[in-house]
Amino acid sequence: MGGLLQQHFIIPVPAQMRSPGEDWYRGTADALHQNINLIEQADPHYVAIFGADHIYRMNIREMLEYHMHKRSQATIAAIPVHKNQAAEFGVIEAAPDGTVLAFHEKRADAPTMPDDPERVFASMGNYIFSTNLLLRELYADAENENSSHDFGRDILPSLVGRAPMYAYDFQTNRIPGDPPNQEPYWRDVGTIDAFYDANMDLRAISPALNLYNRQWPLRTASYSDPPAKFIFDEQGRRGQAIDSIVSGGTILSGGMVRGSVMGRNVKVHSGAVVEDSVVFDNCDIGRRARVRRAILDKNVRVPEDATIGFNHERDKTLYYVTESGIVVVEGHRSTVEVATMLV
């Protein structure tokens, strides 16, 4: 992120009880209230508030321009989802010009869109506020003993009719370098199954979440890992990956990876097979081991000849298994030693 950080900076703010008598974060609004000093010190015209459990790419400039053009005081990014998901999101009723007429937080019977009876207009949990309104509402909410101190449950519904509030249609957001007809990508990854599905999306020939747009690079930490390596080319002992993403430092030493997302410095030994799985950093897959439809946390060691994802009744006695059959294996505290690599 060096080039980015030459002009910008990031201040990580861990949860903390800043004021006497305060508890840990009681809701999304309280999380901002407990750090309100940072907003007041920066004194910006606008504050962008974004959830951390979603996967998407967004040109925030376009949403800010919409907010300014509408002379909005609060703007909610929204996207149509099937009505069966209404109970999972805040649902917006909006006028044709985008004015928010009502906000229903996680109601299964929330009204559908006027032009589409099968979908609701769901809040993405991303907001832009004009600072004066935001500060006023945060202070008022903190004093309200009947509030759950949450944007979706408390602040946004209370703003309807009191302040100019608009819904920004995320479907109109455009990323430089993407094809004109590219649909915006957004996934809520608040569940294990959703997290798994989002990773599996990356396997596509032309993934909906495009990691390869040179005009819109993903800013992330850079490491000094060597390139991934694939070794051995013998029957039953061929290092290869198909329809997969393989990160730096990973070595496929006679092992097969198919339809998977592999983290950094993973070792897949001879005869091992990893299919349709998400493997985090520093995992070690032993000889002839088989892993299918699983999420392996960092530093997991799969013993030789072990199987994961083939017998759910057995897996449930050892690991966590979701209703859809995704096996989640907890990591170990110690890292895999590079020197133990066996070929």
Regions found by a protein language model. Give the residues of each.
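Left-handed beta-helix
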Residues: 132-133, 141-343
